[in-house]
């Protein structure tokens, strides 16, 4: 049985929802952490609803945040616990996305994922394995997990934008070209990348501007 994800929502500014951006937060954070990104985006995406779920588990490394799955080198969990946790979170997120589409009468091509760090890892894992292609994925400061499995498991190939800070000391910037190479090897025709100069493990204004352009031009929002 999947777990129901609690989420913050911001209605479409125009009053008519024609698309949705689902923010997926990083390890130890919560949905509210990324919902602030809706402020600079909403004026440019008036028909877009913004949704930011909390990950399904309390963070093992701290009492206040959430995690999509355990990270062994941070919280002392085992590799098996981490893999099992991710499998459960994938099912939870897929159920959440299905519910968003049903509740708001949206098609998969009207829904985009915007992730940060561990949330990006979830987005890059979930989107290609869904049977109907989502509008796109924006992955800030993440990595593609189990790239060797992707060619055999990919079901759809939505446009993907990878964004990373060149000073990231949490998830190395080399994760970006590694993900791009694996995606292209798996047949993804639309893989875009942007490096945020002088940026650590975070989201800089230039990265957000590129994400906005992607959502408008490639996702049709």
Predicted features and spans:
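Short alpha-helix in the alpha/beta-hydrolase fold that links the catalytic acid
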Residues: 36-38, 172-182
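Short N-terminal helix/helix-N-cap motif within the alpha/beta-hydrolase-1
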Residues: 31-32, 148, 204
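Alpha/beta-hydrolase-fold catalytic nucleophile elbow
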Residues: 53-54, 114, 138-141, 163, ...
């Amino acid at each position: 049985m999947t777990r129901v994800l609690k989420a913050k929502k911001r209605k479409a500014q125009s009053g008519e929802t024609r698309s949705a951006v689902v923010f997926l937060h990083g390890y130890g954070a919560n949905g509210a952490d990324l919902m602030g990104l809706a402020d600079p985006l909403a004026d440019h995406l008036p028909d877009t609803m913004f949704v930011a779920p909390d990950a399904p588990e309390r963070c093992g490394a701290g009492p206040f945040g959430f995690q999509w799955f355990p990270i062994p080198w941070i919280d002392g969990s085992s590799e098996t616990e981490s893999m099992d946790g991710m499998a459960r979170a994938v099912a939870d997120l897929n159920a959440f996305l299905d519910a968003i589409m049903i509740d708001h009468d949206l098609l998969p091509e009207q829904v985009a994922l915007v992730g940060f760090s561990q949330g990006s890892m979830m987005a890059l894992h979930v989107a290609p394995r869904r049977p109907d292609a989502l509008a796109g994925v924006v992955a800030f400061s993440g990595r593609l997990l189990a790239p060797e499995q992707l060619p055999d498991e990919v079901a759809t190939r939505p446009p993907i934008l990878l964004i990373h800070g060149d000073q990231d000391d949490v998830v190395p910037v080399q994760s970006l070209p590694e993900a791009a190479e694996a995606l292209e090897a798996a047949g993804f025709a639309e893989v875009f990348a942007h490096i945020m100069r002088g940026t650590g493990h975070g989201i800089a204004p230039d990265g957000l501007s590129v994400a906005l352009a992607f959502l408008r031009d490639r996702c049709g929002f």
